[in-house]
Amino acid sequence: MSDSGHSQPNVFIPGRNRRRRWMDQGPPGHLNLSEPGREKDPMLRDRDQDRWEGNEEGYGYTIQKTPIILAKPTSDRTKAATPAAPPPMEKPIVLMKAREDGKPAAPAEGATAPPPTAVAKVEKEGQRPTQPVYQIQNRGMGAAASASGNVDPVVGQAKLLPPQKMKHSIKLVDEYMNWCDSAIEFLLDQTDVLVVGILGLQGTGKSTLMSLLSANSPDDDQRSYVFRMQSQEVRERAGNQTSGIDFFISQERIIFLDTQPILSPAILDHLINNDRKLPPEYNLPHTYVEMQSLQIAAFLFTVCHVVIVVQDWFTDFNLYRFLQTAEMLKPSTPSPSHESSGSSGSDEGIEYYPHVVFVQNKAKREDYCPRTLKQMHTVIDKLMLHSHLRYKGTLSMLDCNIFPGLPYDFIESEVNLFLIPTMESDVDETISRAGTSGIPLFSLLPAYKGHPSFHSLISRLRSQIMSMSRPQLSHTILTEKNWFHYAARIWDGVKKSSALSEYSRLLG
């Protein structure tokens, strides 16, 4: 210190320096109280003294302060890291269960939704989760499902249902030869389908046979058959029951097409006696009836895998002549892809031909004689010798064990022929007289029929038809719905066919 009482620069005063160092630390609120005091810690005291002694430039005292880091408490940091909750929905959507007996009604639309805890409690008690329920079904099945009550009580939608079962046949072509679209409601988008059609003269049992092959049993009531049979009144006036083409699809996804009788005298009589106007391209009623029959036959030869030809006596040569004419007039169809893929371009004209099965209905006992059976096969083979229809090699009565004593090569030229007896009850009348005294026991045995039972023969015919091959009807694989649209185009093409028009002109 000078004589004037002022301190000189660069003069070290221990007491003063220590006092000034602790006075310049800043406000007391920012001190780090967790650290030990600098006065008591010898290491901190020596470091601060070195810093003070090294700063001798200038006229003021410069003190380097220890940096202090300011941080929020842990609880505040946790709250800041939590994201903000999304804004609540303006109007919550509540899925309510349908009201049942003994339970209060559901709240109104504007009522407050129950808390989440209540919903979780209900789900824990066994209620199904409110997830969307999807339905794979056809057009028109949704209304049937809602009408039958198969509705999910949680979401109000129809459950997953099996294909709709048909109880009776519907019209595919009406009596005026117009196409009907109602059958598509029963079809699915699957390709494993078999189409079976039938042709025959009037009163040969076409509808009965198709009902037994599709969904009915001989023991069922004939009034419940899927294809309506000829009633007693219609039979007495020699009329026909089926008009146009009837459609039915079984649970095995097999489509059955029942047709009106070909070359029917009842239809001709109806045209003549009722003064029904003929289309302008036909001049005579019998020409119109024959062309109707040819249109139906040509249509079946194009859209069916199997065509059954029924006759109740052996045999009508006009029937075979009619089949050959329909084969000639059938519309051309593309060959299946598995046949045309490896062939040359010259084979593009190969047409599709279905399997043809000849069914001798109402067969008698003598028709099952091996010699008679062999003659039937020989006659049919010679009549169909030049036909392209697949009339042989796909069905055999010898393979059904109907004639156990005959060898498989007994019939040299075996065709697709099957004999069906008259449908009668298998219970013999003599069984009802079992309690009558004085009757020998051997008389209680059933009478000799010469063939298996009607139930057995129908079952064997059905199994052989179901096991037939299913070639492609067109160049692409068709689903059930694709087949329906394909058949509609074929029917329209048959009605507008130039070949059929030219043939009708030649008939006069």
Swiss-Prot record:
> Where is region (Disordered) located?
1-60
Record organism: Xenopus tropicalis (Western clawed frog)
List the SUPFAM superfamilies.
Answer: P-loop containing nucleoside triphosphate hydrolases
Query: Which regions are flagged for Polar residues bias?
Result: 1-10
Q: Which UniProt keywords apply?
A: Nonsense-mediated mRNA decay
Question: Which superkingdom does the taxonomy of this entry point to?
Answer: Eukaryota
- What family does this belong to? Belongs to the SMG9 family.
Basic and acidic residues composition bias: which ranges?
Answer: 36-54
A biological process from GO: nuclear-transcribed mRNA catabolic process, nonsense-mediated decay
The UniProt subunit note reads as follows:
Component of the SMG1C complex composed of smg1, smg8 and smg9.
Task of the protein: Involved in nonsense-mediated decay (NMD) of mRNAs containing premature stop codons. Is recruited by release factors to stalled ribosomes together with smg1 and smg8 (forming the SMG1C protein kinase complex) and, in the SMG1C complex, is required for the efficient association between smg1 and smg8.
- Which InterPro entries does the record cross-reference, listed alphabetically? P-loop_NTPase (IPR027417), SMG9 (IPR039177)
Protein name according to UniProt: Nonsense-mediated mRNA decay factor SMG9
**Any keyword S-adenosyl-L-methionine?**
no
